[in-house]
A protein has these predicted regions:
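Conserved acidic
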Residues: 1-513
Length: 513
């Protein structure tokens, strides 16, 4: 609502004698890029992948020392604001797709970094067969045991688990396209930590960014395109979305600064631009409740900021709910199939799925490149242990400093800045009052510089335990840690403080059972 009211109403010209707003222009763009056929719709969904969550097999369940957390600043916004978007996809011959795929795979990493706003001259959604696929020898991925392709993409059906955050409607529509065969397929495959490590053959649905990442992580004997669509036409991402990102980044940065420096009862002396007037007045007077401000910052500002990507990644054709016997249930009559696809054309469309697919695809590329940069710069002196979407844990030799880590990752920070500066030039020229410098976006922040975790263990995806010398820090999806109550963190901390060996406690405290 904020976007449509404050940004969507901006006039950008006239059409047929009527005012053309950013909102109207964006809806027209979304409509023109909507998949024209069920086959293209299903292919695009099959190409979509979430953030890169992984565990390094070489060090899984092993207690390691001197571990640092590297976190990307506003990962998705790097690609909301710093990547040219493809448009006007058309189905192409398999021969042409083979040529496009080879060109993408032949692109050197340095070229990708030098042209981070548009690393390839063609964009694709393709179904490709790979024979004898395995981790690429001599790479950091082979050495650390890190694979890329999620096992979930190879399943014929996904199971709904209530309470795990997934919308049941998304799952149902995903399973619908899988019934038509739109899922990845592998023969005699080996999976571990939720990833494909090798297979005699595999058929995968990939975009250009995912295909390039595949070429960095895996090698294969032969490759053949089976179907796909492509385009060589690119454009600056929609101002309707990037202006939201710019404004909310400034608001988020200001709110983060305020939460660190505001003291209740004392007038706030610093700049309050970007903060809503009512809250700004209370801050000036020193009467703003710190708990309220923190709640507004974490719940509203960060929520809106993080929600921009999610909006562009949603499936507008997912089925609807209906009320049946007083309960909400999925209305099966609204499920989109190959037979009724044309009957489910969306109305006012504000979702650009090809954009959302490449925002998260860019984040996966960012992580792949970052690991290669660490290995290129520091070799065996660092070991990536695991990661999740925009962060990774790295074990370092004792003589590896934070400055050395930052230096190794400097190329991707420079590439991100250059890509954003290039892509955002129009916004900065046309709306300087709304534009942001987006400073630091895409670069890695070293958590607690100089204070590495002396002990750490990666167990499985999204499950890890760190010991900071005084207490345990546990990340484990689905495991509750109620504040003020006995939980896994207090148990591990108590056991170690009682004299039990750290390595034994970290390995035994959490398990599947």
């Amino acid at each position: 609502r904020m976007a449509r009211r404050e940004i969507g109403s901006i006039t950008v010209g006239k059409r047929d004698g009527k005012r053309l707003t950013l909102d109207k222009a964006f809806m027209e763009h979304c409509k023109s890029e909507d998949a024209p056929t069920f086959t293209q719709y299903a292919l695009r969904k099959a190409c979509f992948r979430g953030g890169f969550t992984f565990t390094a097999a070489a060090t899984a369940s092993e207690v390691v020392q001197n571990v640092v957390s590297l976190d990307v600043t506003s990962m998705h916004h790097t690609f909301i604001n710093g990547r040219q978007m493809p448009e006007d996809f058309v189905v192409v011959s398999n021969h042409d797709m083979d040529v496009f795929a080879e060109r993408i795979l032949d692109t050197p990493m340095q070229y990708v970094l030098d042209n981070y706003d548009r690393p390839f001259d063609v964009a694709i959604h393709a179904r490709i067969r790979f024979d004898n696929i395995r981790l690429r020898k001599g790479t950091c991925f082979d050495k650390w045991g890190i694979a890329l392709e999620p096992a979930s993409k190879f399943k014929k059906e996904l199971m709904y688990q209530e309470g795990f955050g997934e919308d049941e409607r998304n799952l149902l529509q995903d399973n619908c396209i899988r019934q038509y065969g739109w899922h990845d397929v592998a023969n005699n495959a080996f999976f571990a930590f939720g990833k494909l490590y090798r297979a005699d053959s595999a058929i995968m649905n990939v975009s250009e960014t995912e295909l390039w990442c595949l070429g960095q992580v895996y090698e294969w004997d032969s490759m053949e395109a089976l179907f796909g669509e492509a385009t060589a036409k690119f454009r600056t991402p929609p101002d309707f979305v990037t202006l939201q990102s710019n404004e909310l980044f400034e608001m988020k940065s200001a709110a983060k600064f305020i939460s660190k420096h505001y003291k209740y009862g004392e007038p706030y002396p610093y700049n309050l631009s970007g903060i809503p007037e009512g809250i700004a007045n209370e801050l000036r007077n020193g009467t703003c409740d710190p708990q309220f401000f923190e709640s507004w910052y974490t719940g509203t500002v960060k929520g809106m900021f993080n929600g921009i990507y999610g909006t562009q990644a949603q499936d507008v054709r997912r089925p609807s709910y209906k009320v049946e016997r007083g309960e909400l249930v999925i209305d099966d009559t609204t499920k989109v199939t190959a037979e009724n696809y044309e009957d489910h054309e969306p109305g006012n469309l504000r979702v650009l799925y090809t954009y959302g697919l490449r925002i998260v695809g860019g984040s996966r590329m960012h992580m792949v490149i970052s690991m290669e940069l660490l290995y290129r710069g520091l070799g065996d002196r660092t070991r990536v242990l695991g990661g999740d979407t925009d962060s990774m844990k790295v074990s370092c030799d004792a003589d590896v400093s934070d400055d050395m880590l930052a230096k190794a990752l400097e190329p991707i920070a420079d590439a991100s800045k250059a890509a954003i500066d290039s892509t955002m030039s129009r916004i900065r020229r046309n709306w300087p009052d709304k534009a942001s410098s987006l400073k630091g976006i895409g670069s890695f922040d070293i958590e607690n510089r100089g204070e590495h975790y002396p002990w750490h263990i990666e167990l499985w995806n999204k499950c890890r335990v760190s010991w900071d010398g005084e207490r345990a820090h546990v990340t484990c999806a689905g495991l509750r840690r109620p504040i003020g109550e006995t939980n896994i963190e207090t148990v591990i901390t108590s056991l170690i403080n009682a004299g039990y060996p750290i390595e034994e406690v970290l390995q035994e405290a959490i398990g599947y059972n």
